[in-house]
């Protein structure tokens, strides 16, 4: 099978395109496919805070595959063993949470690359990623098409941001607003002026270093701010939150209920 691997999401980042995404926390392939038909540039399948197994992630990758939306998987953490599994099921773009140091970033880069560039285990003949051994020269293609994003979401990570940005193999840095605001002493308040100032400065530093800058904003006004500041891959909602808002809004048409505004909620 003489197929060439491609990663449109990574190519978009290279070109500087702005890519609008959606967070998938519902854990179902059915909801993932519905989202894929909406036209978002990318869909984040969340394995950190949503109760997804590796097989759940696999089924959602399958559901998204026929459509133009590009899947991004966030595993629960950046261990070498888990990264190997997620790559083998066909993920080409990963978002690794809680990366605090350049050394952590280098370890993640190594876990995602086949030797001699890294330490990813070899098992292409039994992996969906290689179409069970049918993609010629898969290992070299996989190293090239992989897109690796890391999350900066703590005071320690902020202190080490410049060093993280220097790590070869990191394609983009994502600012985690909920954990970051808590780490800075403003829990559940990513809208605090000091947090906002830091987010804007981080986005500028990331882009100045030649990397892509990402963000999740459940408030549309905050999403627009981040885009104006230079973030070029921004998730503008979470499927489960949008679902609860729609349910509450519909019920409010017929019963007296209190609905929670998106602008007052954080992820």
Curated annotation (Swiss-Prot):
Function: Catalyzes the reversible retro-aldol cleavage of 2-keto-3-deoxy-L-rhamnonate (KDR) to pyruvate and lactaldehyde.
Reactions catalysed according to its record: 2-dehydro-3-deoxy-L-rhamnonate = (S)-lactaldehyde + pyruvate
Cofactor: Mg(2+)
Lineage: Bacteria, Pseudomonadati, Pseudomonadota, Gammaproteobacteria, Enterobacterales
Gene Ontology annotations for the cellular component aspect, listed alphabetically: cytoplasm
Residues that, per the record, bind Mg(2+): 153, 179
Site entry: Transition state stabilizer: 74
Protein's UniProt keywords contain DNA repair: no
NCBIfam families reported for this sequence: PRK10128.1
Sites annotated Increases basicity of active site His: 88
Any single Pfam family the record assigns to this protein: HpcH_HpaI
PANTHER family: 2-KETO-3-DEOXY-L-RHAMNONATE ALDOLASE (PTHR30502:SF5)
Organism (species): Salmonella typhimurium (strain LT2 / SGSC1412 / ATCC 700720)
Protein name from the UniProt record: 2-keto-3-deoxy-L-rhamnonate aldolase
MF terms in GO: 2-keto-3-deoxy-L-rhamnonate aldolase activity; aldehyde-lyase activity; magnesium ion binding
Binding site residues for substrate: 151, 178-179
Residues at the catalytic site: 49 (proton acceptor)
């Amino acid at each position: 099978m003489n197929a060439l691997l491609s990663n449109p999401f990574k190519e978009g980042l290279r070109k500087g395109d702005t890519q609008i995404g959606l967070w998938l926390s519902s854990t179902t392939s059915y909801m993932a496919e519905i989202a894929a038909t909406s036209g978002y540039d990318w869909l984040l399948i969340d394995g950190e805070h949503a109760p997804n197994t590796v097989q759940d992630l696999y089924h959602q990758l399958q559901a998204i595959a026929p459509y133009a939306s590009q899947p991004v998987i966030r595993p629960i953490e950046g261990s070498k063993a888990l990264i190997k599994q997620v790559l083998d099921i066909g993920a080409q773009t990963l978002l690794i949470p809680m990366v605090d140091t350049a050394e952590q970033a280098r370890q993640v880069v190594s876990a995602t690359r086949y030797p001699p560039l890294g330490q990813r285990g070899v098992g292409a003949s039994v992996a969906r990623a290689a179409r069970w051994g049918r993609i010629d020269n898969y290992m070299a293609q996989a190293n090239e098409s992989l897109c690796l994003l890391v999350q900066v979401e703590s005071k320690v990570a902020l202190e080490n941001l410049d060093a993280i940005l220097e790590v070869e193999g990191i394609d983009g840095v994502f600012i985690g607003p909920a954990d970051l605001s808590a780490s800075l002493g403003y829990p559940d308040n990513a809208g605090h002026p000091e947090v906002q100032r830091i987010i804007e400065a981080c986005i500028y530093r990331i882009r100045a270093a030649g990397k892509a800058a990402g963000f999740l904003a459940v408030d549309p006004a905050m999403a627009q701010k981040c885009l104006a500041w230079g973030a070029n891959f921004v998730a503008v909602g979470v499927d489960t939150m949008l679902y609860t808002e729609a349910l509450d809004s519909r019920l409010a048409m017929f019963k007296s209920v209190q609905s929670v505004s998106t602008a007052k909620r954080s992820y």
